Every structure is written in C-alpha cells, then in structure tokens.
Amino acid sequence: MNIVLFGPPGCGKGTQSKRLVAERGWVQLSTGDMLRHARAAGTELGRRVAAIMDGGNLVSDAIVIELIEERLPEAKAAGGAIFDGFPRTVAQAQALDQLLLDRGTQVDSVIELKVNDEELVQRLVKRAEEEGRPDDTEDVIRKRLEVYYGQTAPLIPFFAQQGKVKAVDGMGSMDEVAAGIAAALEEK
C-alpha cells in the first residue's frame, strides 16, 4: 500500500508517519531525510544533491523522483510506502503517479490531516521553543502556512479527482489521530 500523508506544517505528518512505520513495517519516504541521506552517503547522486544544496538552490523534481525511485524496491518488499513531505506540487504528484504506474502500482490513499491554523501555530511555536529554533517565530510560521495553502494545498483536488483523499481530524491526541488514520486506511 502506498499512502501520502498530507497537511500543513505542524499537523503531525512526521509523528504519524513514524508510527505507521513502527506498526505496519512500511517504509517512510521523507524527501528531507532522503536528501540528507543521499548527501551524507557521498554517492554520485548524493554529490549532485550536495552541490545543489550548497549553492542555496532547490533540488529539482527530477532528482527527488530519482531518490524516491531508488527506495521503491525497499518499500515494495516492506508492503508499503508512506510519502511524507512529497509531493508538494501538482507536477510532483503527476511524476509520482507515473513513476508508480510504470512499476505496476499507485498511490492508494491520501490522508489529509486537518488542523486549524491557530492550533498549528501553537504547535510550531512550542516545537521551536523545545528544539531551540529561534528563527521559527510566529511570523515565520504563518508565512510557512501561507506558502502551504498557496502551493501545496492545491494537490487536494488533484488527488480528490482520483477518489483517493480521506480527511482525518488531526486535532486530537496522537492516539486519536492514529486511530482516525487506521480507520481511513480501512475504507474502500
């Protein structure tokens, strides 16, 4: 099963993704983690990633897709993949659909974690304080939310047209959200 965990910064994607990995044995495909790992590994692809990132540039969709492609056999063997932080644009979603289709599989479900903006801001401010991120001010966090709603949220209609979006209330406890995700994954 291939699922996309979707929602704004602070909605709990990373937390719930790690939980699904622990409970179901699936592979988490977090683009941020994959970029850092590729860079640290020093492979040819990793050196390309490092050069791009060191130049202050965004890594292209093609390279991100290449990183995902490298991990798909592992995900297949594990029985599933959790896409966390990808796709972020319709172009990336189309590329992911094609990549999976070429391998005889697909995105099975898109779990949209719904959390109101004020709760998101509170969570992110708290996380910034706990993790010592002085740059994550409330203004910066609100800007990140604006970017999400402007650039990433338009993916919901893309996947909704395919009948794959399942909304889950992300306002509860971690256990309540996990139960909501489990129920959504059982829906056909």
UniProtKB/Swiss-Prot annotation:
Catalytic activity of the protein: AMP + ATP = 2 ADP
Localization annotation: Cytoplasm
Keywords attached to this entry: ATP-binding, Cytoplasm, Kinase, Nucleotide biosynthesis, Nucleotide-binding, Transferase
Pfam families (UniProt xref): ADK (PF00406)
Biological pathway: Purine metabolism; AMP biosynthesis via salvage pathway; AMP from ADP: step 1/1
Protein EC: 2.7.4.3
Source species: Maricaulis maris (strain MCS10)
SUPFAM superfamilies: P-loop containing nucleoside triphosphate hydrolases
Residue ranges of the region described as NMP: 30-59
Protein name, as recorded: Adenylate kinase
Disulphide bond pairs: none
